[in-house]
Amino acid sequence: MGCAPSIHVSQSGVIYCRDSDESNSPRQTSSVSQGPTAPLHGLFVQTDAADAMPPSRAAGPPGAVRVRRSRAELGSGSSTGSSGPATTTCRGRRRHCCSSAEAETQTSYTSVKVLLIFAKEDSQSDGFWWACDRAGYRCNIARTPESALECFLDKHHEIIVIDHRQSRNFDAEAVCRSIRATNPSEHTVILAVVSQASDDHEEASVLPLLHAGFNRRFMENSSIIACYNELIQIEHGEVRSQFKLRACNSVFTALDHCHEAIEITSDDHVIQYVNPAFERMMGYHKGELLGKELADLPKSDKNRADLLDTINTCIKKGKEWQGVYYARRKSGDSIQQHVKITPVIGQGGKIRHFVSLKKLCCTTDSNKQIHRIHRDSGDNSQTEPHSFRHKSRRKESIDVKSISSRGSDAPSLQNRRYPSMARIHSMTIEAPITKVINIINAAQENSPVTVAEALDRVLEILRTTELYSPQLGTKDEDPHTSDLVGGLMTDGLRRLSGNEYVFTKNVHHSHSHLSMPITINDVPPSIAQLLDNEESWDFNIFELEAVTHKRPLVYLGLKVFSRFGVCEFLNCTETTLRAWLQVIEANYHSSNAYHNSTHAADVLHATAFFLGKERVKGSLDQLDEVAALIAATVHDVDHPGRTNSFLCNAGSELAVLYNDTAVLESHHTALAFQLTVKDTKCNIFKNIDRNHYRTLRQAIIDMVLATEMTKHFEHVNKFVNSINKPLAAESEGSDCECNPTGKNFPENQILIKRMMIKCADVANPCRPLDLCIEWAGRISEEYFAQTDEEKRQGLPVVMPVFDRNTCSIPKSQISFIDYFITDMFDAWDAFAHLPALMQHLADNYKHWKTLDDLKCKTLRLPSDS
């Protein structure tokens, strides 16, 4: 790339080799070049030549082959020159490619990374270093067990070479075990370098090495070619096999998320694998199927008597079979499937497995309608059953060719116009809503006038942008409801010139002398006793707030994150987690009456409680759980104690930055990631790979943005229509098997996570009465303070009823529960089964209703205060 690499030695003793960020020189500064190397997986790989060499090795080993390169070989920007240090290299090399047939089955990866763990430099470590250099591997050297583990967790090497010749510097087997205890080591090959056995001693057994986690043993030999041969054998043997195993993990992940039912059997028809879609379709759990013969499962009596013999005759010849087959579900129902069975040739050129793909043959009403329209309109291209069954995936749309040909008798014009019209049609029908509109338009053609007019009205509604949001004006003219809707569901009313509200955060740190815990085991006994009850919904967060001096988030976070194995998933230490929780909590404003770290801890507690419910747990994987807990922790970080509407009306810096759209929610997520990644001491994401990080980050952002109230009804209605209604139909024994619930589909997992954090965020009315009353007082005080400031600054008062002199808190709570809470928690309860919460909600509503009937505007009756 034209840059000179630099060598960095960390404080922990790892020699890190990387390209220099400071050099922009296009010149080649190395006096040592590399020859051709062995192929790796048949892919072109460019490396930076083991990152770099230690200074002592820069001149090359004795007898090293030096190859001069032409400008063409080095590239136009990498000519040899005299500038730059003469002992550093920046080389790229290319590997030859395998056949296209093999390449199609491979997964790409960068050059092999090797970690050498030697306490001191000697001829053996030199031999492996130069062998790595010759092979084009990226190489690091670690001198201590601690630095070795740190380096491995950072770079995830494919090969690790550990010096096992002497034990006075470190215990090689202990080092190996510590590496094997980490998740990234699953596909790593670890090589032990052992001393040559003397002639009078019997050669030692390799079993202790294997038990410690080593894969291979290498007899001490400092010859570069011996080390090179060993590494090349490992690359072409174990490393390549490990990459195939990694690819298998990806394949099985794809199978688990595939919408088609997949069944894999052995050559004697013993079931060896079924995916979740198969379980949903057939009603069995895979534990009931694995290891059973297909002949032992119940059969449907709707198939032809000779169908099974026909299928077996076909597939035993190595031919693929596909057709319609009736299967019997666990419930006893017969379902019609389109089945495709493929024999898999394995060892010895014989059939070793059969892979079956199964789809339900269920024609929806819309498909029937389209089929009828095609038939009635005389479109003969779709009249053959076979053609109809195997036509384009866009079968739910009207054929463009038949439409365009109706009004024209000029074939040449039609032929010229058809390709462009088809392209336009293919662009517009991809969106699901467009498919729906096309189906309705087709249905109108043969419908009575009254039905056609009704469908016109349906089309008008479908063409609006807010399909899931209710018409707010249809609600009763209750001022409390109107103010809540205006204050929480709009991003601002109007901008008043000259009234710029500059948002400045004021972080309040507690000055108590309560020492922070290093781990969950170091929590003071008084706090630990409170946290013993944190799994209960009735957990009192205010007691934790008091005993922790308004720092409940760190302590509850340590306990909850430990319970869900967050550190293990993120591959970080509890010290890093504690530092992160401290930073996040420090950026909550303790001066806020409501939006402070106690509210964040309360939302974290509710989220953890929901994650423990059986159906929620069964719908999400561990990444979802970790993302939900992190999102709950950061969802209101740096909240100013003012609503989005206030910030937009005041022209705050944040409102300008985020274009008056989801201002606070966008700020919470952005700041949370900024705080996390700017300091490695609190960066809980530093040890996860890029793909996991991006997936986790996207999930966290999506959940925090879901707490914005402007899309409240959209999220709730999508959840009801996509999750609750299919579940209800399933429980009622619906005959339609076309659309299984699919709670584990990614799009449905997103809806579940959004609904979960939304409910956790506003769960105060579902808490025990004393807690509910305290939260009501706090949120009212925060709204009162906002109204006071709006009046002082001459800003629009977005919630006039929250005037501390006239407000009825019971009325505001009743309106909030009626408008936002009841329907949402009814839907969430139908999914997660939360009878205790719903009872609290009913009791609390009764409390507020009693106060309102008595014309009491306070939190409690005066006699109860």
From Swiss-Prot:
Chain spans, region Disordered: 17-40, 52-92, 373-415
Which segments show compositional bias classed as Polar residues?
A: 23-36, 402-415
List the active-site residues: H595
Tissue specificity annotation: Widely expressed.
Domain (PAS) spans 247-318
Respond yes or no to whether keyword Disulfide bond is given for this record.
no
What are the recorded GO MF terms, alphabetically? Answer: 3',5'-cyclic-AMP phosphodiesterase activity; metal ion binding
Catalysed reactions, semicolon-separated: 3',5'-cyclic AMP + H2O = AMP + H(+)
Residues reported to bind a divalent metal cation 1: H599, H635, D636, D761
Which function does this protein serve? Hydrolyzes the second messenger cAMP, which is a key regulator of many important physiological processes. May be involved in specific signaling in the thyroid gland.
Q: What is this protein called?
A: High affinity cAMP-specific and IBMX-insensitive 3',5'-cyclic phosphodiesterase 8B
Biological source species: Mus musculus (Mouse)
* Protein encoded by which gene: Pde8b
